């Protein structure tokens, strides 16, 4: 039941292949934490405003949050986080002067989670 949310800076609208990233991310999640491909769900959210540091540079942010059913160990979650961080730049076109900040986190879904 991976529920995946990708937040990204508005400045990446034309430079971030969000669909391509999701389609590459799903098999990575399956391999790393033993999920089912058909269960992977990703939604992207454009952040209208992103302020990083003193806002002096042309920085951009991609943050990936992954929520899984319980049962995965901390090591598997850490491997997935590192793999996600490595994958993101492959789907963002480089731009002169831009610094891309990438972060990721993996959490267990709340026990109240239900799916229909």
Where are these regions (language model features)?
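A domain-level signal for the structural core that forms small-molecule/cofactor-binding pockets
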Residues: 1-116
């Amino acid at each position: 039941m991976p529920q995946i949310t990708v937040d990204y800076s508005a400045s990446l609208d034309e430079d971030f292949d969000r669909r391509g990233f999701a389609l590459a991310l799903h098999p990575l999640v399956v391999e790393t934490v033993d999920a089912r491909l058909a269960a992977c769900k990703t939604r992207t959210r454009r952040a209208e405003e992103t302020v990083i540091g003193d806002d002096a540079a042309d920085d951009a942010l991609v943050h990936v949050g992954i929520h899984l059913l319980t049962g995965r160990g901390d090591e598997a979650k850490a491997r997935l986080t590192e793999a996600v961080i490595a994958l993101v730049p492959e789907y963002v076109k480089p731009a002169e002067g831009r610094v891309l900040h990438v972060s990721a986190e993996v959490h267990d879904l709340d026990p109240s989670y239900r799916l229909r």
